[in-house]
Every structure is written in C-alpha cells, then in structure tokens.
UniProtKB/Swiss-Prot annotation:
GO terms for molecular function: ATP binding; pantoate-beta-alanine ligase activity. The gene is panC. InterPro entries: Cyt_trans-like (IPR004821), Pantoate_ligase (IPR003721), Pantoate_ligase_C (IPR042176), Rossmann-like_a/b/a_fold (IPR014729). One of its GO terms (biological process) is pantothenate biosynthetic process. The reaction proceeds by a bi uni uni bi ping pong mechanism. (R)-pantoate binds at Q61, Q153. Keywords: ATP-binding, Cytoplasm, Ligase, Nucleotide-binding, Pantothenate biosynthesis. Pathway: Cofactor biosynthesis; (R)-pantothenate biosynthesis; (R)-pantothenate from (R)-pantoate and beta-alanine: step 1/1. It comes from Bacillus licheniformis (strain ATCC 14580 / DSM 13 / JCM 2505 / CCUG 7422 / NBRC 12200 / NCIMB 9375 / NCTC 10341 / NRRL NRS-1264 / Gibson 46). This is Pantothenate synthetase. Beta-alanine binds at Q61. The active site is at H37.
Amino acid sequence: MIQIYTAKDIQNLTKNYRKEGKTIGFVPTMGFLHEGHMSLVEKARKDNDIVVMSIFVNPMQFGPGEDYEAYPRDIERDRQLAAGSGVDVLFTPEPEEMYGQEPTVTASVKKRTDVLCGRSREGHFDGVATVLTKLFNLTSPTRVYFGMKDAQQVAVVDGLINDFFMDIELIPVETKREEDGLAKSSRNVNLRAEERQEATALYRALQRGAELIRNGERDPEAVKREIRSILEKTSGVIDYADIYSYPDLEIRDPLTGKVIIAVAVQFSKARLIDNIIVDIPADQKEDL
C-alpha cells in the first residue's frame, strides 16, 4: 500500500492509473476505521482495479460546538487496517493541504439539507460537498463508495454528482451493524457502558416504524409517534425522528414510494444516527 500526503502526488498517481486504463474505487473516510468502512473497501476491491481510501477529518463539516477536536483519531491503527483490507493507496492530507490559508470557493448545497442532520448542523453538508468535490478531483474515481448509515449524505452526494455532470458512479453500501443491531460508527467508542446498551433502541425503533408501514400504516405522524415512544425510554436527547421520501427528502403524506425513516439521538458524548429505507409497493399505494 502506498501512503500519500499531498494533493499533487495523489492527483498525479491517479491520473496515471486512469491513463493506463485502470478503474479506481474511492472510499472517503474520516478515519478511526471499523467494519463498516471495511465493507466499503471490500465492495470497492471487487469492482475495481485500484482502491483509494482517504482519511481526512474535515473541519468544514463540523459546526460551532461540535466534536471536531474530540473526533477519534488513530492514524497508525487506520493505516494497518487499510493495508490489511486491500487498499492500494491511502491519502492522508492535513487541513492546510486541502484548504490552504482560506478557501476561495466552497460548495453550497441547495436541496436535501434542510431536514434531518442538516436542520441542526448548519453548513455541515456544504462542508461535505466542498471536501468531496476536492477529493473527487484529486482521486479521479470511477466509482465512489458510501455507507447507507449516512443516508442523507448519500442523497447529497447523488445530487452533487448529477448536478455537476461528474463521470462517477455512486455505490451505496448497506449499513454494517453490531450483533445487537447498533450501526457501527466511529462515535460508538464515546458511549458510556449504560448508553451503549440504550443505543440499541435506535434500530429497534426503526424496525418498529418499518413494520408499521409494511403492515399498511400510511400516516407519517403515527409512525413517528411510535418511534419516539421507544427512543424516549433512553437517557439520550432525541434530535429527530422523521420520515421523508428518498432520495429527495421531501414530506410525503400519505406515505408512498420509497421512504426513509431516520433518527438521531444525542447521548452524553456521542450523537448517533441511523435509518431504514422502506419501499412501498405500487399495489399498496393504490389501496390508499
């Protein structure tokens, strides 16, 4: 595995790969790798000649009072995991390399960001779109891989690629979970022991919501009430428990088509998110 630190070096390397006719699968991460990241690498390894991973804790996507400094980092551990999982090129730039002293141009996301995480994290997805535009330009990917745990991010990336006519294929990958259903996340290490047990309520609540919809419930408010009743039994503070169309993230009442049930709960030192996608069959829509 090659480790690269500068924009110039990664751009030159990946351009040469593409000139040689090789396909590149790109896995952008913020590090502190876990099995969820490894599942992205595994998929990228199967699909492409070259796998490039970036590890960059992007300061632009952290708002005031958020956990940029506290975000877990262990680059040596990550380097070993990346090498062992089949990554060919690891790109680990410093913030100064990506942004210089002060950015001249940044991205502004106009849709799909005023709900869910975007509602309480002003500017977050502008930061995501800005850094991904830079990383896509640097790594020349054929395909990019994102976990569906961050489904709103996947929706934003879908818009970014389509709106800017990027010749990149977006590959969403199913959320990787612990045995008890908790979505794997770098932030899970910040949970206290009792919070770790309580955190399983997120997936239970989502499963219950999906069950209601599959059994014919089409009132989003009724589904949200049931989800909240489960989450309220934890010590965490509910940020949101919502249902929208997917990937457009618009209100749909009654519920039809593909919808996302998404939750976010703030525990003492960790904000956890999770979601389930439910595809309502056309014949069920007609019965409404």
